[in-house]
């Protein structure tokens, strides 16, 4: 169903999020780093970190090229939470996001938010390598590196830190202007920041590799992936972007390799979901996707069973993207027949059906899906099929429940707004659109839409009270966010 919702935006948030980091402590029996205390607490509480994270996530949604694909979002969050469940010092909820960017990179920021570039799927040979990058970023969060960086900058150069935070936001809206501002702001203190960053990167490797191993992934994947990055830097005139934001001296690679060698060797097979996610990312979100994806699918077709199935899925996806619906259906059919409850296959089958104006076929298939009640991806697919099939009330029934349980999913609010518009429920359409604006950090517009919704219902009604209460909540949120909007 995501084909109808896909966006193509251009923005970046990368280098700003990894500046000025200071090495903290980690109390683990397998780690030999000294305990440097918890001094970040004197600058930011966990609650403040989460509030700042909420603010920046909203800016990210509103400005960055997020891949708001339900299947990929579900996959990276499932993989991420598997890693988080084996991490120590977890003090915040975690959320994982995917940005459409052909540069290899990832970053973590306040409140347990981790962002991956789509290029990581292209360069990760297996699931353990992708997980190694995520474990590294998770470790930045659990060690509170960014909070400690803020403390150090406030102590040594407070105006530099305030300027850097302002540049982060500017970089979201205008990458060139934002990075130019950031470069100027940091010019006077760059060398100290780089040394801190190197120390933090090495610590995130050391802790991340433990998380990786405890989660059942191959610890050798981390040094192997780092070595790939170094090789690319050696033989390219332009190093990978991740090396600009995550310093990688030879000593860091040697340390990661030494630590992995001390761990029990593991033979780990990548999950089928990894191959399907990689095929989907390359097939839909890679600028050079046609030839690159075809070459990879040819290779997978000769591989193990999981790779072969992913290759067939990728071929069907390619055909669908080219509007060759009959070919896509024929290619997908054996997979769907073998696994009729597979969400990846059901999602693609829905897109094929809707592309051929066969909404009723999609509806009947999805209504009988085994995991419909528990799988958000299938629920969104069914709601979208109802909407495309001219049954907006059925769609609204699903989406009202969905948005109640998934308040941070803009896909749900967008579809609900479409359904309410088709039903001529103007106030409810405005309210749903307001939630989408709020998620994207556009609180003024959200409040304006809710005010319009409130004016269209009966004076003194329960519905009006609900709209007015939501307006009050958003105004309170604006007040909490004011310190960040002034940076």
UniProtKB/Swiss-Prot annotation:
Main location: periplasm
Details of cofactor binding: Binds 1 zinc ion per subunit.
Signal peptide: 1-27
RNA-binding as UniProt keyword: no
GO MF annotations in UniProt: metalloendopeptidase activity; zinc ion binding
Cofactor section: Zn(2+)
A Pfam entry, by short name: Peptidase_M48
Positions annotated as TPR repeat: 309-342, 344-376, 377-409, 427-460
Active-site annotation: 137, 205
Cystine pairings recorded for this chain: none
GO cellular component: membrane; periplasmic space
Entry keywords, A to Z: Hydrolase, Metal-binding, Metalloprotease, Periplasm, Protease, Repeat, Signal, TPR repeat, Zinc
Residues reported in the UniProt entry to bind Zn(2+): 136, 140, 201
EC number: 3.4.-.-
Cellular localisation: Periplasm
BP GO terms, sorted: chaperone-mediated protein folding; proteolysis involved in protein catabolic process
Tree of life domain: Bacteria
Family according to the record: Belongs to the peptidase M48 family. BepA subfamily.
Function per UniProt: Functions both as a chaperone and a metalloprotease. Maintains the integrity of the outer membrane by promoting either the assembly or the elimination of outer membrane proteins, depending on their folding state.
HAMAP family xrefs: Protease_BepA
Protein name: Beta-barrel assembly-enhancing protease
Organism: Escherichia coli O157:H7
Gene (UniProt): bepA
């Amino acid at each position: 169903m995501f084909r109808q919702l896909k966006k193509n935006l251009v923005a970046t948030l990368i280098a700003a999020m990894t500046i000025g980091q200071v090495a903290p402590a980690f109390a683990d029996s397998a780690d030999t780093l000294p305990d440097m205390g918890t001094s970040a607490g004197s600058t930011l509480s966990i609650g403040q970190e989460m509030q700042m994270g909420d603010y920046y996530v909203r800016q990210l949604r509103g400005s960055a090229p997020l891949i708001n694909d339900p299947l990929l979002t579900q996959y990276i969050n499932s993989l991420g939470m598997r890693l988080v469940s084996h991490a120590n010092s977890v003090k915040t909820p975690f959320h994982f996001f995917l940005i459409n960017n052909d540069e290899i990179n990832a970053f973590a920021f306040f409140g347990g938010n981790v962002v991956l570039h789509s290029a990581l799927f292209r360069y990760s040979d297996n699931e353990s390598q992708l997980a190694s990058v995520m474990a590294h970023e998770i470790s930045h969060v659990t060690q509170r590196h960014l909070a400690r960086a803020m403390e150090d900058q406030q102590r040594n150069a407070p105006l530099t830190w305030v300027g850097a935070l302002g540049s982060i936001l500017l970089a979201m809206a205008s990458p060139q202007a934002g990075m130019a501002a950031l470069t100027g702001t940091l010019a006077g203190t760059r060398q100290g920041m780089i040394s801190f960053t190197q120390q933090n990167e090495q610590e995130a490797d050391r802790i991340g590799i433990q998380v990786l191993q405890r989660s059942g992934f191959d610890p050798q994947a981390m040094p192997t992936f780092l070595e790939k990055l170094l090789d690319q830097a050696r033989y390219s005139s332009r190093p990978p972007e991740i090396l600009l934001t995550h310093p990688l001296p030879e000593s860091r690679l040697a340390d990661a390799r030494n630590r992995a060698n001390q761990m029990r060797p593991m033979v780990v097979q990548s999950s089928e979901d990894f191959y399907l996610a990689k095929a989907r990312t390359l097939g839909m979100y890679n600028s050079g996707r046609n030839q690159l994806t075809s070459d990879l699918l040819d290779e997978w077709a000769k591989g193990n069973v999981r790779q072969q199935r992913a290759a067939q899925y990728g071929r069907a996806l390619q055909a669908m993207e080219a509007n060759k619906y009959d070919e896509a259906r024929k290619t997908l059919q054996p997979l769907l027949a073998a696994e009729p409850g597979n969400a990846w296959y059901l999602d693609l089958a829905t897109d094929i059906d809707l592309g051929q104006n066969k909404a009723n076929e999609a509806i009947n298939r999805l209504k009988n899906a085994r995991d419909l009640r528990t799988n958000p991806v299938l629920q969104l697919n069914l709601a979208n099929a109802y909407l495309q099939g001219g049954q907006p009330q059925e769609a609204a029934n699903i989406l009202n429940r969905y948005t109640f349980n998934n308040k941070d999913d803009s896909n749900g609010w967008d579809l609900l707004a479409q359904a309410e518009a088709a039903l001529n429920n103007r106030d409810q359409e405005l309210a749903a659109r307001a939630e989408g604006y709020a998620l994207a950090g556009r609180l003024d517009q959200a409040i304006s839409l809710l005010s319009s919704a409130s004016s269209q219902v009966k004076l003194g009604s329960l519905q009006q009270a609900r709209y007015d209460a939501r307006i009050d909540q958003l105004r309170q949120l604006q007040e909490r966010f004011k310190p960040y909007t002034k940076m």
